[in-house]
Every structure is written in structure tokens, then in C-alpha cells.
Design a protein with these regions (language model features):
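AMP-forming adenylation/ATP pyrophosphatase catalytic core
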Residues: 1-160
Length: 160
């Protein structure tokens, strides 16, 4: 009975969830995605450090996001969505960006996104949109991450 009940339970995962990192740091979305939203205190030091771009792509200035955007939700793509990839300075349809970025077809309809209306602020695996990176003025940094649960994780979660 467990294997049959588990997929039905996961299909009932919401299509979108309100973005509330302080109250609800973990989220689940359809397609078996499980993620975390973490607020980190920004402690920039005066010394120079070598930082890899991949270490920063899932981090953004939390105050900038909450000041500029309202109605934040975590969800999958919808018609009319637009994304401004970091460093490119232009906005393009999310559908076109996914084609250019080589996002596998089977992930496109379930890939977690942080959105404000049709503007996409974060794409799982790509990072935050242009202009949201933390800087020396940032006090709080938002770190977002998500992955598809393994069957073992799903079974363990169900058994709890």
C-alpha cells in the first residue's frame, strides 16, 4: 500500500506556495521538488576574497527583493513569464530562455521559480535575476536552493 499512496500524496503538493522564508523556510512543489529558503546575516569583511560565481548564484539581497517586488510566490512556469538572466541586462520570455539554456523538457513544467506576477526572480539551477546580487550595502542575504527528492527521502518522509 505504501508505494501506491506515495505518488498520490506527492501529486497533491501545491502548484505554488507563498514565499515566506522567515515563517516557512522549507517548501515542496509538484514534481517532487523540495527546497529551502534561508536568510543569512551579511557580514562582509574588508579583506579581499576569491569567490566563485557558482557560490553566489543562489544568493540575493533580501531587502532589495522585498522592497521592489510584492506578491512573491514559489511556483513552476506559467505562460507570459519573463526572466532577466544575471549579467545580461535584458529580459526575455522564460520559455525562450529555457530553450537557450538547454533546460531538459521534462523539467520545464516543474522547475521551481520565485516569481512576482510574471517576472521571474529566481530559477532553480540558474540563480537570481540581474540586479539582485548582494553587495556591501546588503544586511540580509536570501539563499534559495531546491532539488528533486530521491525515492528514499520520499519514503522516509512518508514514514515519519
Amino acid at each position: 500500500m505504501l508505494p501506491d499512496a506515495l505518488p498520490r500524496q506527492l501529486e497533491r503538493a501545491p502548484q505554488q506556495v507563498p514565499f515566506l522564508p522567515k515563517e516557512q523556510p522549507e517548501f515542496r512543489l509538484r514534481g517532487g521538488w523540495k527546497g529551502t529558503a534561508e536568510l543569512l546575516r551579511a557580514d562582509f569583511e574588508e579583506k579581499i576574497q576569491v569567490v566563485h560565481k557558482k557560490d553566489l548564484k543562489n544568493r540575493a539581497d533580501y531587502a532589495r527583493i522585498t522592497t521592489l517586488y510584492t506578491g512573491l510566490v514559489l511556483r513552476a512556469r506559467q505562460p507570459g513569464d519573463r526572466f532577466r538572466p544575471a549579467g545580461r541586462g535584458l529580459s526575455k520570455p522564460l520559455r525562450k530562455w529555457m530553450n537557450e539554456a538547454g533546460v531538459p523538457n521534462e523539467l520545464r513544467d516543474t522547475l521551481p521559480l520565485l516569481a512576482s506576477g510574471s517576472e521571474i526572480l529566481w530559477v532553480c539551477g540558474e540563480g537570481f535575476a540581474d540586479g539582485l546580487a548582494p553587495d556591501t550595502e546588503s544586511r540580509w542575504i536570501l539563499h534559495l536552493d531546491a532539488e528533486i527528492e530521491t525515492q528514499e527521502e520520499k519514503t522516509n518522509e512518508y514514514a515519519r
